[in-house]
Curated annotation (Swiss-Prot):
Residues 190-235 form a coiled coil. Pfam families: EF-hand_7. InterPro entries: Ca-binding_regulatory, EF-hand-dom_pair, EF_Hand_1_Ca_BS, EF_hand_dom. This is EF-hand calcium-binding domain-containing protein 4A. Residues 41-69, 71-106 form the EF-hand domain. PANTHER family: CALCIUM-BINDING PROTEIN 8, CALCIUM-BINDING PROTEIN 8-RELATED. Residues 1-32 are annotated as: Disordered. It comes from Xenopus tropicalis (Western clawed frog). Ca(2+) binds at residues 84, 86, 88, 90, 95. The gene is cracr2b. The keyword Metal-binding applies. PROSITE patterns: EF_HAND_1 (PS00018), EF_HAND_2 (PS50222). Gene3D superfamilies: EF-hand. Residues 1-10 have a biased composition (Basic residues). GO terms for molecular function: calcium ion binding.
Length: 256
């Protein structure tokens, strides 16, 4: 699924809590400098994937790392699937950074893991400025999902579909993929029906055009035949008239 939209902003309270935590934490030891470096690299990779500044990345976005990581497209898909623990089709910055660090074997200290866990909770609770932005983000995700399924023109304006999709995503995520598969099949069927309808209309138009052409040809042939017949009859009348005139002249001459 390709998700479009504006990047959600970090709330002022979140910035203050992060700055306070950084100011009071103990200096990192050489043992945990590598994880910090890894998290920074993960952030850079996330930015490379998130060219549109959506605030999250999809499986397609992750393919942009082919030039950065020695991984094939199939391996990148496998990486995405392993990081997408919630099976919602996208990764947040926290999910990507934490998951990538674990995937590459970076061992965090107990204190660092605890802090990252707190950071993750902070991100979850403070990333958005309010419910309106969350609704906008979900609406954009739904739109992107429908676009990916090829169903945007069919189901985009159906509020019932939108509400059911949102409810499954929040309450029954294990059923969401089945619902999206159903939408994909229905939209594919509707597109096929529309294609057949368009094909039939084009065939009828061609048939009408061919029929009109045949009618015009018949009309032209009929006009030509009428013209020939008219000329033949006129010629016949002229011949008869000329013959009658000659007979009449002979009759007059004989009487004289």
């Amino acid at each position: 699924m390709a998700h479009l939209g504006s990047r959600r902003r970090m709330s002022p309270g979140l910035r203050t809590r992060i700055a306070h935590r950084k100011a009071h934490r103990t200096p990192p030891s050489p043992l945990i400098a590598e994880p910090d470096e890894m998290m920074g690299k993960a952030h850079e990779l996330f930015q490379l994937c998130d060219k549109e500044d959506k605030g999250l990345i999809t499986k397609r976005d992750l393919q942009r790392l082919q030039n950065e990581l020695p991984l094939t497209p199939e391996q990148l898909e496998a990486v995405f699937d392993s990081l997408d623990q919630s099976n919602n089709g996208y990764l947040t910055p926290v999910e990507f950074s934490m998951g990538l660090g674990k995937l590459l074997g970076v061992n965090l200290s107990h204190e660092e893991e605890k802090e990252n866990s707190m950071m993750e909770e902070t991100f979850e609770s403070g990333w958005s400025d309010g419910p309106d932005e969350e609704d906008d983000a979900e609406e954009m995700l739904f739109s992107a999902t429908m676009e990916h399924l090829g169903a945007s023109r069919i189901f985009q304006e159906h509020k019932e579909i939108r509400d059911l999709w949102s409810r499954l995503r929040k309450e029954r995520p294990e059923l969401l993929s089945h619902f999206e598969e159903f939408l994909y099949r229905v939209s594919s069927y509707i597109r096929d029906v529309h294609h057949e309808k368009d094909t039939l209309e084009q065939a009828l138009k061609r048939k009408e055009t061919d029929h009109g052409r045949e009618v015009r040809c018949l009309y032209e042939e009929m006009e030509q035949q009428i013209k020939i017949e008219r000329e033949r009859l006129l010629k016949k009348v002229l011949i008869k008239g000329d013959h009658g005139l000659k007979n009449y002249s002979h009759l007059i001459m004989s009487k004289v």
